[in-house]
Structure formats: structure tokens, C-alpha cells
Amino acid sequence: LDIAYFGESPAFDALLAMLGESPAADFGPLPADTLAAASFTLAAPGDAENGELLAGLDMLAAPASFINDILPKLGGPSVVFMGEADGENELEIPVFGMALRMDDDTVASELNAMMDKTMLLANLATLQWETDPIRFNRGDYQGHGYRIAEIGAPLAQHTGWPEFKAMQVVYGRVGDYFFVCTGEHFFHQCIDAHRGEAPLRVRFDGPVHERATTPIMSIAMKPEGLADMMRTWRAVLGDEGLELDLSLDVPMIQTELGQNIELLDPFDAMTMQLWRGEDGLVVGRIQLTAPE
């Protein structure tokens, strides 16, 4: 399935402007239980039309500068991924992660400081919520040290959802990567994948679009696993809780995932790649694979 973006969406245009050239299919050491992943490279503000996100990261990096001190030490691409983990009441909860490849490993200390500051700011929110504070611990797995922010208890108290109790923010350096995950088990899988001890369950293998010039993002999914997770949460939240507006200021592009879960079932793999094509046009290719 080939796609092309001709719309005029400020939100989508701002997102696309922040994406630089990215290796076509480089996902790095993904956790074994990954259900979806996206690989991309952030463009420097001088090359992007909108540097607001990077300016916000600059604030978290102070007194260092994310744009001038940290970003130049990162190698592309960055990867975000999601999977699922055991939660309360035997309910599988979504877990998320991010991997930043480092060209200069001295940047790990600056990234740790950014995450520490982010968690400190998050802890201030618990004062307004009048909940337990976020508690901090350290962990070690296979010789890799990392930091843990126990965000689950205050989130569960604030929302009334005990399923959130298992949520954590776990972060640290693993080789040439800096990982951030919302679960310690997921972080351990990142370490296992980096050591080559866990199989990569999501693979990307898609043809290049004939109008492509610059690859900007690659996405890989396990549709069946995502469908199972959404069915579980539809039973908990109801259909309205899974409605997702994907319009991005383009009203013709809308869907309600809660009503269309079954569309994912026939496929065991889905990949998508986006490129900048002729005259800046964004083109893409989606490839769906059914079991043999």
C-alpha cells in the first residue's frame, strides 16, 4: 500500500520538519516483547521549521544545552517502542521505551541528569495531587546499573486505577545506547537484546518507494499482538476509551480503533517507511504480512 501526504496540517508539518535523514531500517537492540517500534532521527533546529520541542529539551538540560551540547553527541537514529508487561489483577499493561544511540558516551551523564530533573519535576506534581511521592531506587542487571523512579503508586492514587501501580520509569546507559523504559522488566529485555541474548521479534524488511529520496522514519508492528492488547483494554475501558482521532487537522483521516480492532487480526507483521520525495512531498509504503 503506497501513501503520499498532500495535506496542509500544521501539527503534522511541524512533526515532519523535525525529522532528519534516518537509516532505513535501523531499530537497534529492541526488547524481545516489542509490539511496535518507530525509528527516526531528530533534525537540528537550523534544519527544521519548528524547534519548539528541542527548545523545551534545552530547558531540561540546563545548565548544558540539549541543542548545542547533547544533540551533537547523539548518533541516529532514535527509536521509540512499546510492548506489554504484567500489571495488577493479571492485566497486561502497555509499556513504552526509547533508545538514544550515543556517538560520544560522555553524554550519558548529561542524559541521566536530564531524566533526574524530569522526575523531580514530576514529583512536584504529586504535591498538587496529594498522593504518595515518587520513590527512587537503583538497580543492576548483567553488570549494567540504572535508575528507577516508582511512578505507579502516585498515578494509581491520582487516577483511581490500581493497574498503574506497576508503572516505573527506568533509565540508564547500556553500551552505546541510553534507554528509558516504563518498566524494569522491559529495561532488562533491552540489556538482553544488546547482549544478543534475546531474539528480535519485530523485523523490518520493506521495499524502497520509487519516489523516495530521503528516509525519515521506519515503523514496525505486530498487528495481532496489538489487537489482543486493545481487546483486553476495550473490555476494561469500553469502546469509548479506545477511540483515537488520527485526523491531525486532516478531517478525512480519522478512525476509531475501538471499533476496528479485528482489522489487525489477519496479519502477523506490518511495516511502514516514510521518505521525503520530490519537492518535499512525503511518501510512504505500508507492507502487511499474513501467516503462511
Task: Label each region the model flagged.
Residues L1-E292:
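Signature of soluble extracytoplasmic/periplasmic domains of secreted precursors
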